[in-house]
Amino acid sequence: MYVILVYDISGEQGGEKVLNKVFKICKKYLTHIQNSVFEGELSEVQILKLNKELNEWIRKDLDSVILFKSRNNRWMKKEMWGKNDDATDNFI
């Protein structure tokens, strides 16, 4: 399954440590394409593992993670406006 993950981590109450940990977890599973944005192919099992790891760090009252899912990245067309640093083809 093709996924796009975006997160918003608050700087309050030790947010920098949380941000660093969330970034490292996401990097294990997905390709970093922009600040707080990752994309890639994951199985349902990998999505569950990612969710479990992130939930150990995400502070539900301060932080958020959004996961967009698609059966296949062919259903999305990526358009880059401005600086284009990555080598991926498809995006919402």
Language model features by range: what are they?
Residues 24-25, 51-56, 77-78:
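Intrinsically disordered, low-complexity boundary segments flanking structured domains
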Residues 1-37, 41, 45-46:
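Extended, hydrophobic alpha-helical segments
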Residues 4, 26, 50, 85-92:
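Unusually extended, aromatic-enriched hydrophobic runs near protein termini
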Residues 57-92:
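C-terminal structural segments of small proteins and small subunits
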Residues 34-64, 69-71:
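Short, intrinsically disordered low-complexity segments
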